[in-house]
C-alpha cells in the first residue's frame, strides 16, 4: 500500500496532500475532543498506532508500492475513522523515517488510502453489521468484525489502485483499464492477506473480550449486557482441523473460485465488458488467456478462466497445507523468522556522525531535494540528486555500504515492478517493441512509455535516497522537537511520542512472548501457528493496555498538565554545513529551471 517516494507525479501528489491535510485536521479536532473528554484513552490510542505500525511493516512487493496487512480495522472499530486518520498519519511518518517505507511527497496519498478510506469502510460495515444482525451472539459479532477488518484492508488497496491509475492511465481504456490492472496485481497477495487479517483481528477481539471486557464498555463499543453474552461463548474450545477437513475446505475453495472466474469471464465476453479480461493479471505466472493462432474457440475462454483460477486456488490451499507440515517438522536448530526481525533505522541515526547537525537543516536539505526531484520533467536531475545523496550517506555520514545497498534493494524492486507496468501499458509515441494484446489491453513498449518509465524510476530513486539520508542521520526524537517548535497541537505530539514508545514496548514484549511460545511448541502446526500468533497479538494488546494505564497513573501522580516534557534539540548549524546545503539547493533549482526552459 505504501506508494513509494517519487512515484506520483505532479499535480497528483499535491492533490492528495491537500486532501489529506483536510482529513487529518478534522481528525485532530476529533482527537482533541476525545482526549479532553476521556484522557485515559490517550495511551490506548498510542497502543493502537503501534499495532498498526507493526502489522503494516510486513510487506510484499507490488507495483510501485507494497502489499501488507494494514491493521487499521482494529483501530477504526475502537476509535472511529476520524481519530484513526491521525494515528495512521503518525504511523506513516514513522515508517517513512524509521523504516523508509513510503515517502514524503506520497504521504498524502498513503494517508488517504490507509488512514481514511480503509478505516471509513471498516466503521461503516461494522455499524451496519451491528444494526442488521438478527440477534447478538459471538458468531454475528465475529462475522461483523471479520467483514470490517477485511474491508479496511481491501478498500485501502482499491484506493491505492485508483491513485496509481489516475496518475498513470492506460493508453487503451484510460483510468478504468489501468485501475483494473493495478488492482489485479495487488490482489495476488492482498486477497489472502485480507482474509488472514480478518481472522486474526476476530481472534484478537474475542481474546480481549474474554480478558478485559471493560475495554469495549469504556469505549462505548459494546454494552455490559452484550459483553456478558459474548463471554460464555468466548471460552469454548475449538475442535482441531483434521486432514480430511483440509481436503474438503480446499475442494470448496477451488470450486467457488473457479465458478466465480467462469462467471466473470462470461460477463467479459458481453459487449462493453471486455475490460474484465484484465482479471488474468491476478496470477501473472499462469498462461495469459489469448490465442494468436486461433486454436481455442471464444466459447472456451470462460472454461480457461475457470481452470486458471481453480489451479491458483488449489496451489494456495496446498501451500497452506505444506506450511502446516513444514511447521510441524521444523526443529529448533535454526532461529525462526519472526515479524520483529525488521531493522529499526533509528539505531543507525543515533550513531551517525551527522546526528549533531540541526534537524531543521537536514529537513531543508532532504525535502528540497525530494520536491525538486519529483518535479523534474527529465530523468537526469533526479539521478544527479540520487548520486549526491548516496555520496553524502556513504562518505559523509559513513553509513555501511552493505547496509545501504540492502536498504535500497526492496524499494528498487517495487520501483522496477511499477516501471515495468508503466512501460507496457502507457503507450503513445512510436512503437519500439510490440508484444501482444489481451482484450482491451495492448502490451507494447513505445518511446513515450519508455521515457515515462525512466522518469518515474529516476524520481523514485532520488526520493528514496533523500529519504534514506534523513532516516539514517536524524533520530526521531529530534523530529519531535521540530514538531513542537512548529506549534503543532500538543495532543498530536503526545500521541506521536506514545506511539514511538509503544513500538519498542511491542517489540520487546512480543519477542519475549514469541520465544516462550516456541519453547512450548506453540508453532508446531498451522492451526497452532494461527492460534498462537493471535494470542500473541491479543496478549500484547492486554499488556500494553495495562502498561498504558500504569503510565497514565504515573503521569498523573507527577502533575501531568497535558504537556509531555521534551528535551531541546541539541543540533547545531555550522557556516560550512549551511553554505553546502544552500549551494546544493541553488544548484538543483537552477538545473530544474534549465530543464524547464529546454522543454
UniProtKB/Swiss-Prot annotation:
GO cellular component, one term: ATP-binding cassette (ABC) transporter complex
Location within or outside the cell: Cell membrane
Annotated keywords: Cell membrane, Cobalamin biosynthesis, Cobalt, Cobalt transport, Ion transport, Membrane, Transmembrane, Transmembrane helix, Transport
Pathway membership: Cofactor biosynthesis; adenosylcobalamin biosynthesis
Membrane topology designation: Multi-pass membrane protein
InterPro entries reported in the protein's UniProt record: ABC/ECF_trnsptr_transmembrane, CbiM, CbiM/NikMN, ECF_CbiQ
Domain of life: Archaea
Region of interest (CbiQ), residue spans: 341-599
TM region positions: 12-32, 44-64, 74-94, 106-126, 140-160, 162-182, 183-203, 247-267, 303-323, 356-376, 377-397, 407-427, 438-458, 463-483, 493-513, 579-599
Any one GO BP annotation for this protein: cobalamin biosynthetic process
CbiM, as annotated region: 1-239
Main location: membrane
Single GO MF descriptor: cobalt ion transmembrane transporter activity
Job description of the protein: Part of the energy-coupling factor (ECF) transporter complex CbiMNOQ involved in cobalt import.
Similarity field: In the N-terminal section; belongs to the CbiM family.
Assembly: Forms an energy-coupling factor (ECF) transporter complex composed of an ATP-binding protein (A component, CbiO), a transmembrane protein (T component, CbiQ) and 2 possible substrate-capture proteins (S components, CbiM and CbiN) of unknown stoichimetry.
Record's protein name: Putative fused cobalt transport protein CbiMQ
Gene: cbiMQ
Amino acid at each position: 500500500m505504501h506508494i513509494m517516494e517519487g512515484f506520483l507525479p505532479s499535480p497528483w501528489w499535491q492533490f492528495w496532500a491537500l486532501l489529506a491535510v483536510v482529513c487529518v485536521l478534522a481528525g485532530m479536532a476529533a482527537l482533541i475532543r476525545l482526549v479532553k473528554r476521556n484522557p485515559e484513552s490517550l495511551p490506548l490510542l498510542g497502543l493502537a498506532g503501534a499495532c498498526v505500525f507493526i502489522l503494516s511493516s510486513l510487506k510484499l512487493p507490488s507495483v510501485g508500492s507494497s502489499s501488507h496487512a494494514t491493521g487499521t480495522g482494529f483501530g477504526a472499530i475502537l476509535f472511529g475513522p476520524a481519530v484513526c486518520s491521525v494515528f495512521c498519519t503518525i504511523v506513516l511518518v514513522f515508517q517513512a523515517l524509521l523504516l523508509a517505507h513510503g515517502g514524503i511527497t506520497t504521504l498524502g496519498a498513503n494517508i488517504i488510502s490507509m488512514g481514511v478510506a480503509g478505516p471509513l469502510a471498516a466503521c461503516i460495515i461494522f455499524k451496519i453489521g451491528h444494526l442488521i444482525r438478527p440477534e447478538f451472539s459471538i458468531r454475528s459479532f465475529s462475522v461483523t468484525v471479520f467483514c470490517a477488518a477485511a474491508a479496511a484492508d481491501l478498500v485501502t488497496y482499491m484506493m491505492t489502485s485508483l491513485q496509481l491509475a489516475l496518475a498513470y492511465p492506460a493508453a487503451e481504456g484510460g483510468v478504468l483499464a489501468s485501475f483494473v490492472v493495478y488492482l489485479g496485481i495487488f490482489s495476488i497477495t492482498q486477497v489472502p492477506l485480507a482474509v488472514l487479517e480478518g481472522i486474526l483481528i476476530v481472534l484478537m477481539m474475542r481474546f480481549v473480550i474474554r480478558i478485559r471486557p471493560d475495554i469495549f464498555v469504556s469505549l462505548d463499543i459494546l454494552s455490559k449486557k452484550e459483553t456478558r453474552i459474548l463471554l460464555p461463548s468466548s471460552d469454548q474450545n475449538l475442535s482441531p482441523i483434521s486432514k480430511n477437513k483440509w481436503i474438503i475446505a480446499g475442494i470448496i475453495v477451488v470450486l467457488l473460485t473457479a465458478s466465480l472466474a467462469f462467471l466473470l469471464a462470461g460477463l467479459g465476453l458481453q459487449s462493453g465488458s471486455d475490460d474484465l479480461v484484465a482479471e488474468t493479471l491476478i496470477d501473472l505466472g499462469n498462461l495469459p488467456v489469448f490465442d494468436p493462432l486461433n486454436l481455442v474457440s471464444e466459447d472456451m475462454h470462460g472454461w480457461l478462466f475457470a481452470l486458471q483460477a481453480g489451479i491458483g486456488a488449489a496451489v494456495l490451499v496446498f501451500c497452506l497445507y505444506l506450511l502446516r507440515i513444514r511447521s510441524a517438522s521444523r526443529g529448533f536448530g535454526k532461529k525462526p523468522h519472526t515479524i520483529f526481525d525488521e531493522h529499526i533505522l533509528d539505531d543507525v541515526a543515533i550513531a551517525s556522525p551527522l546526528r549533531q547537525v540541526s534537524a531543521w537543516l537536514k529537513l531543508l536539505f532532504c525535502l528540497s531535494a525530494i520536491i525538486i526531484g519529483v518535479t523534474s520533467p527529465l530523468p537526469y536531475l533526479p539521478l544527479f540528486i540520487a548520486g549526491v545523496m548516496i555520496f553524502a550517506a556513504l562518505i559523509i555520514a559513513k553509513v555501511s555500504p552493505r547496509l545501504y545497498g540492502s536498504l535500497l534493494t526492496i524499494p528498487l524492486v517495487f520501483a522496477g515492478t511499477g516501471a515495468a507496468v508503466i512501460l507496457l501499458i502507457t503507450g503513445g509515441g512510436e512503437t519500439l517493441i510490440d508484444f501482444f494484446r489481451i482484450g482491451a489491453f495492448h502490451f507494447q513498449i513505445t518511446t513515450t512509455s519508455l521515457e515515462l518509465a525512466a522518469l518515474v524510476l529516476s524520481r523514485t530513486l532520488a526520493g528514496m535516497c533523500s529519504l534514506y539520508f534523513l532516516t539514517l542521520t536524524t533520530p526521531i526524537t529530534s523530529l519531535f522537537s521540530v514538531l513542537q517548535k512548529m506549534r503543532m497541537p500538543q495532543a498530536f505530539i503526545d500521541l506521536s511520542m506514545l506511539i514511538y514508545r509503544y513500538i519498542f514496548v511491542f517489540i520487546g514484549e512480543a519477542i519475549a512472548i514469541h520465544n516462550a511460545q516456541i519453547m512450548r511448541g506453540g508453532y508446531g502446526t498451522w492451526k497452532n501457528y494461527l492460534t498462537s500468533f493471535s494470542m500473541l497479538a491479543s496478549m500484547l494488546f492486554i499488556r500494553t493496555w495495562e502498561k498504558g494505564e500504569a503510565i497514565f497513573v504515573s503521569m498523573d501522580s507527577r502533575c501531568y498538565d497535558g504537556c509531555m516534557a521534551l528535551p531541546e534539540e541539541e543540533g547545531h548549524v555550522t557556516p560550512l554545513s549551511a553554505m553546502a546545503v544552500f549551494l546544493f539547493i541553488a544548484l538543483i533549482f537552477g538545473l530544474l529551471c534549465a530543464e524547464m526552459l529546454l522543454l
